[in-house]
Amino acid sequence: MKSIVLLRHGESIWNKENRFTGWTDVDLTEKGVAEAYRAGNLLKEKGYVFNKAYTSYLKRAVKTLNCVLDRMDQDWIPVEKSWRLNEKHYGSLQGLNKSETAQKYGDEQVLIWRRSYDIAPLPLSEDDPRNPRFDIRYKDVPDKELPRTESLKDTVERILPYWKEVIFPTLRTADQILVAAHGNSLRGIIKYLKNISDEEIVHLNLPTAVPYVFEFDDDLKLVNDYFLGDPEEIKKLMEAVANQGKKK
């Protein structure tokens, strides 16, 4: 049996402030660091020994991965970073408070911006300083590939080539792989793996720093998937994520 563990980063500063984050490079909160270490403890207790790990270019995912591997005493394993694992780009919404935005535009519109499959928020302007083309970490990425906004469909189209060509083939020579990334980038992978419809993916809520295990047979066919942890606690965490974009 082979496995890939998907892990959303721990709570970030803008998660705590209920802001749209996207490609903004915000740090983890103290709670987020503790969540990451807790995930590391859980994975260690379950006996996971990872052959390789993947993460994004954003520090909240990178630090989550570092905390997990540190707690597991597996800091030495090879790690590959890719911008393709970054969070969905929220365009002009980045930095705005989700509840305040819902008060202004309504819960339904914010849900569409957050979770619809093919509708993107209004894009950043070309000269907006938040445009990724001004960020040195993306200097080797062609400008035409760098988003100024994204729908989940756009995010999936960005991620899947990397999943299919880089991450998943690693299972041919590895038994266990860890991917530490973001809510929407991971939802794109999960949608693909479980063949979830465009309509149903709107209702998938991933809690922070809860390992989601996907098990494959020797022919690399998916045979099982499950969260690690207490089911009731995980359910409450999912509900909290679902409520982030609602009016208070």
UniProtKB/Swiss-Prot annotation:
- SUPFAM superfamilies listed in its UniProt record: Phosphoglycerate mutase-like
Extract the CDD domains matched here.
Answer: HP_PGM_like
**MF annotations from Gene Ontology:** phosphoglycerate mutase activity
Q: Which GO terms describe its biological process?
A: gluconeogenesis; glycolytic process
Annotated EC: 5.4.2.11
Task: Mark the transmembrane ranges.
Answer: none
Show the SMART domains listed in the entry.
Answer: PGAM
Q: Which Gene3D superfamilies match?
A: Phosphoglycerate mutase-like
Catalytic machinery residues: H9, E87
Q: Which HAMAP family match?
A: PGAM_GpmA
Q: To which protein family does this belong?
A: Belongs to the phosphoglycerate mutase family. BPG-dependent PGAM subfamily.
Q: Please report the name of this protein according to its UniProt entry.
A: 2,3-bisphosphoglycerate-dependent phosphoglycerate mutase
The encoding gene is: gpmA
